[in-house]
C-alpha cells in the first residue's frame, strides 16, 4: 500500500486525538499534551493517509532542535490497526529520521514498551539499539520501557548504532 505523508497542522489534531486512545489504550496522551506537543517549535509531526482512499492511517512525531544538536526524540509512531503490517510504521520512522538528519541531529532516542516485539524488531532493523531499561515505566500495567538509540556520525558518516 502507498501512503501520503505531510506535515501535521493544528487542524489535524482532532483526528489525531480521536485515534490516540484507539491506538495506545491507557498509554494514550491527553488531548492537552498532544496539542502542546504538535505545536511545540522543536516538534516535527507527520500525518499519513492512504494514497488510494485518502483514509487517515497514522501519525508520527520527532522532537529535536531545528538548528541541530546532539539529541532528538522519536515521540510517537501511531498506525491504525487496519494499516499495520503494510510498511507504514517503517515509512513514518524513515521520514522522521530524514528530518533528524536534516536538522543535523547525531543521536536519536525513543522508548518502546518491552512487550511490543513488533515495534522492537522494526527499530532494531532501522539501526536502533537498546541502551537502557526502565522498569514499571508504563502505567497502570507496570510494563518496562526499553530506551533505544541510533547514532549518526554526521553528514559524511551515515547512521550507526
Language-model features: locations:
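Conserved catalytic-core motifs of GNAT/GCN5-like acyltransferases
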Residues: 111, 124, 129-146
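Conserved hydrophobic/aromatic "anchor" residues
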Residues: 24, 59, 83, 122, ...
